[in-house]
Amino acid sequence: VTKIEEIRALFSIERVGKDFREKYGRDYTEEDVQECYKRFQKVLFDTLEDYTEPIPGVVEVIAKLRAQGIKIGSTTGYTQKMMDVVIPAAEKKGSRIDNCVTSDNLPGGRPKPYMIYRNMCDLDVASRFSVLKYGDTIADIREGVNAGVWSVGVIMGSNELGLTEEETRTLPMGELKCRMAKVRDRMYAAGADYVVDTIAELPMLIEDINERMAL
């Protein structure tokens, strides 16, 4: 899902449409969607570099996987211009990927599989069984499912969990576990092969998958 598609979906929510009519005396149009997207882009570009801090554990896990010869590709709802800001800023903080694909010149973004396929071409990976899609949203899970690759969801720090680091630390453990269980259920319902609590579990999971494939 691209950012403009998310904005378009927001406008289509009944309550949002009602509020728009009450304020402007008319239904929204595609021009309103485009204008909102332009404003969103300006705000985003002004602050984008400030939000490129890697999630705890990401840098270490990427380094470990790369040392094993695993290539790291990314799919994103951001545009290429946005990623031209994000990638260098993230690299300065230790997070380096081998390839990044946006949906700019493809038939569609997540959950369609095209960005995964483009990554496979760019990174010269011939078999879908050698690809693992790791993500924190239902769209990520479905992208992996639609591409026919291993699809793995992560809970902590995810959009699906919807908690900041501070909220995660201060939330009563029982409530946190309950929320995590609901996210896990949603991800499996979307077709995930596996769901992990944190990215730290990913290397061990990949070892397990490799062992299963070797049987």
Predicted segments, located by residue:
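Structural motif
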Residues: T75-G77
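Asp-based, Mg2+/Mn2+-dependent phosphohydrolase catalytic module
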Residues: V59, A63-A67, T79-L215
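N-terminal helical cap/lid subdomain that shapes the substrate entry/recognition surface
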Residues: V1-V59, A63-Q68, D84
